[in-house]
Structures are given as structure tokens and as C-alpha cells.
A protein has these predicted regions:
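Pair of pore-lining "gating" transmembrane helices in MFS-fold secondary transporters
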Residues: 44-64, 144-148
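C-terminal transmembrane helical hairpin of 12-TM major facilitator-type secondary transporters
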Residues: 112-157
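C-terminal membrane-cytosol helix-exit motif in multi-pass small-molecule transporters
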Residues: 6, 11-31, 218-223
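Juxtamembrane intracellular "pre-TM" segments in multi-pass secondary transporters
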Residues: 23-54
């Protein structure tokens, strides 16, 4: 199979995706035009910045490791080069399943909780693959798990950005993508630093771990803010209900 066949397959997949979006995604009305300046108002709040930072740090953490998954598998885990396509396929399957699993349970948990929990599992998987990379089954399983976590948290993070954006939803979605791409680039650079210093390939997971840890910290703060506000709203509803009961009492 020539290299042109791979491009043809990718183009066919893109065409199928385009057709599926046209068929399955419902039409929605255009967003109201609130003016240019209004699109930036949501950036006055803390929460969008926390989520944007977490998107960059979390994805940067994963790609610090994943950018060097080939040398990790071949030189540390002793996975044959002929099996690398299987490893990459498993990681891709993990991404799909992580996204689907998050969607399945999204009605039972808040987006803040899902994002923080997924980020927590991501950082633990990166720490684990650093120590267990010499055992090929663990290295492959943890790589798949980490890949699943990245796309597990992507949905809740996008929802959090859109929900906090108000008049600037398109800008928020764009900034989330910018943060994602910046995290990928910076993460790949940081992951390569230990290798440049002569360390084994599994050391790429260490910068990834600390990036993911920082991202988890931001999402944890975001979750705390959400929890405090939920408690305040609950207390307000209880107080209003008490006042209503007292007003009806003889």
C-alpha cells in the first residue's frame, strides 16, 4: 500500500464524518449578535481561565508522554516495532471509549466533577507508566487509559467553556482549541527534555505528570467554586421554602 492510499482513507473518513454531521446534528438558530466587545466579557470571570489552563496543561501532560510512545514501547517496554500499529490503534480506541463513557455518565455527575476526576486518573496513569513501562502489558494498558482520559475530559471541559461564555460562546470554543493545540506543542517539547538529557524514554512521562497535576489543581479549584455556589443556591432555596411555609402558617 502506497502512502497515497493512507491519504485516500483519511479523506474518505473525513467525507463520511461530514455526511454524518449533516444528517445527525440538528439545526439550531444562529447565536444573537451581542457586539464585538460583549464576546470578551466572560473572560472577566475566573472559571473560564481555570478551564482554559486545565485544557492546555492536561493535554500537554498527555502529549508530553504520547509524543514519545514509540521509543517508550520499543526501547523500554520491548514491544516489537511490528506491534506499534496495534498499540496506536488501542490508544485510539481508548480515546473513543473514553469519550463515549463520559457521555454515558454525564447525566449523573456535574461537568466540574467529571473533568476533575478524569484529570486525576490521567495524572495517575502517567505516573504509573513511568514506573511500569518496563512491563509491556502495563505500558500498553496505561497508554490506552491515558488516551481515554484525555477524551473523557474534553467533553466536560468544552461544556464548561460554553456555559461560562454567555455572549462569547464561539470565542470560548476557539480559545479552548487554541489551548488544546498549545498544550500539545509545549507538552511534546517538555517531554523531550529528559530524552535530550540522556534519560530513558519513559522519563517523558514525568513532565507529563507534573503538567497533568497542575491541570488537576485548576479543575479542582473550579470544582470547589461550583460546589460552594451549589451549596449557596441550595441554602437559598431552603430559606425561601421556609419563608413560604411560615407565611402560610396560621
Amino acid at each position: 500500500m502506497s502512502w497515497r492510499a493512507a491519504f485516500a482513507i483519511a479523506a474518505a473518513a473525513a467525507l463520511i464524518t461530514f455526511a454524518a454531521i449533516r444528517i445527525t446534528v440538528p439545526k439550531v438558530p444562529a447565536l444573537p449578535d451581542s457586539g464585538f466587545a460583549a464576546q470578551f466579557r466572560f473572560l472577566r470571570s475566573l472559571e473560564p481561565w481555570l478551564v482554559l489552563g486545565a485544557i492546555g496543561l492536561g493535554n500537554g501532560g498527555f502529549f508530553a508522554y504520547y509524543s514519545y510512545v514509540n521509543p517508550v514501547m520499543e526501547h523500554v517496554a520491548a514491544v516489537p516495532a511490528s506491534m506499534m500499529s496495534v498499540v496506536i490503534t488501542l490508544a485510539g480506541a481508548g480515546m473513543v471509549l473514553g469519550n463515549l463513557f463520559c457521555a454515558k455518565i454525564s447525566s449523573s455527575f456535574s461537568d466540574e466533577s467529571l473533568a476533575a476526576a478524569g484529570q486525576g486518573v490521567l495524572l495517575l496513569s502517567l505516573a504509573s507508566v513511568f514506573f511500569l513501562a518496563h512491563w509491556s502489558p502495563a505500558a500498553i494498558a496505561l497508554t490506552t487509559l491515558a488516551a481515554g482520559c484525555v477524551f473523557f475530559i474534553s467533553g466536560p471541559e468544552q461544556v464548561l467553556m460554553i456555559r461560562n461564555a454567555k455572549e462569547g460562546q464561539l470565542l470560548a470554543a476557539s480559545l479552548a482549541q487554541v489551548s488544546f493545540n498549545a498544550g500539545n506543542a509545549v507538552g511534546a517539547w517538555l517531554g523531550g527534555l529528559p530524552l535530550d538529557a540522556g534519560k530513558a524514554a519513559n522519563w517523558a512521562a514525568m513532565p507529563g505528570f507534573f503538567l497533568a497535576l497542575a491541570g488537576f489543581g485548576l479543575l479542582f479549584v473550579n470544582w470547589l467554586i461550583h460546589r460552594v455556589r451549589e451549596e449557596e443556591r441550595t441554602a437559598g432555596r431552603i430559606a425561601a421554602l421556609k419563608d413560604q411555609i411560615q407565611s402560610k402558617a396560621p
